[in-house]
Curated annotation (Swiss-Prot):
GO molecular function terms noted in the UniProt entry: bitter taste receptor activity; G protein-coupled receptor activity
Keyword Glycoprotein belongs to the record: yes
Cytoplasmic side: 29-43, 109-128, 204-229, 281-302
Protein family according to the UniProt entry: Belongs to the G-protein coupled receptor T2R family.
Record's miscellaneous remark: Several bitter taste receptors are expressed in a single taste receptor cell.
One Pfam family per UniProt: TAS2R
Name the record gives this protein: Taste receptor type 2 member 104
């Protein structure tokens, strides 16, 4: 049985997960409709669709995993099925971070304004940059996946033999976990760099506008601000997501604190949920589609 606080926290986390599924499904449907209507899928819509689909899978996997651990259903679930879920999560999580980073790079190349020849080369050859990101995804995935397999195998051994914990140092567990996530972490660092460069670009642009005596925000400034909101939100939420997964992992190995585990689940569910709604609110097309959907719902009610 769960305590009152545990039940409330689990309800909050579950609500986050369901809202995340709805928000990301909405993004997929809007972009799919646009694809069918225009007979083509733009680069930004491809990234947003891939990001939304990967997050839907992420939400279902972390929710199912959390419920099986909270209600001790892992004993009833075949170990091979749980292991398979873990491998799927590793792949989907990597893809989700890659799509988020690609979105940040897309905003950076489209909006930022630098005179450096490397930036100008990247801006003119955005398609090649996209191919490079795919290669980077494969390399980081191949580098981190073997360690992820080791961590998953360690969890499987631990669940079948609790005395194994004696041979595992806390520092070793933490190091293995961090290195197993080096792929997503390296992509996350690229997103931070893109956000930092966008900030510099905005600062330079603001100084330029002040020097010509303009007291109003122009379209370039608005574009900078929207892109930075998306990137900063991603950075903050991904840190919370990473901490949440880390808390869940440490609870599995080092303590049997169910409340702390559910708190970790609540943190991890915030990232795929909240960021999807931030994307909707900062995208003109998605915001317009949301308003149309709300108007239709009002018409149905009347």
């Amino acid at each position: 049985m769960l305590s009152a606080l545990e039940s409330i926290l689990l309800s909050v986390a579950t609500s986050e997960a369901m809202l995340g599924v709805l928000g990301n499904t909405f993004i997929v449907l809007v972009n799919y409709t646009d694809w069918v209507r225009n007979k083509k899928l733009s680069k930004i819509n491809f990234i947003l669709t891939g990001l939304a689909i990967s997050r839907i899978f992420t939400i279902w996997i972390i929710t199912l995993d959390a419920y099986t651990k909270v209600f001790l259903l892992t004993m009833l679930m075949p170990s091979s099925l749980h292991e398979c879920m873990s491998y799927i999560w590793v792949i989907i999580n990597h893809l989700s971070v890659w799509f988020s980073t690609s979105l940040g790079i897309f905003y950076f190349l489209k909006i930022a304004n630098f005179s450096h020849y490397i930036f100008l080369w990247m801006k003119r050859r955005a398609d090649k940059v996209f191919v490079f990101l795919i290669v980077f995804l494969i390399i980081t995935w191949l580098a981190s996946f073997p360690l992820a397999v080791k961590v998953i195998k360690d969890v499987k051994i631990y669940q079948s033999n609790t005395s194994w914990l004696i041979h595992l140092e806390k520092s070793e567990l933490l190091i293995n976990y961090v290195f197993a996530n080096m792929g997503p972490i390296s992509l996350f660092i690229v997103a931070i760099i893109a956000c930092f460069l966008l900030t510099i670009s905005l600062w330079r642009h603001s100084r330029q506008m002040q020097s010509i005596g303009s007291g109003f925000r122009d379209l370039n400034t608005e574009a900078h601000m929207k892109a930075m909101k998306v990137l900063i939100a991603f950075i903050i939420l991904f840190i919370l997501y990473f901490l949440g997964i880390l808390i869940e992992t440490l609870c599995l190995f080092l303590t049997n604190n169910k409340l702390l585990f559910i708190f970790g689940f609540t943190l991890s569910a915030m990232y795929p949920c909240c960021h999807s709604f931030i994307l909707i609110l900062t995208s003109r097309e998605l915001k317009q589609a949301t308003m149309r959907a709300l108007q239709r719902l009002k018409c149905c009610e009347t």
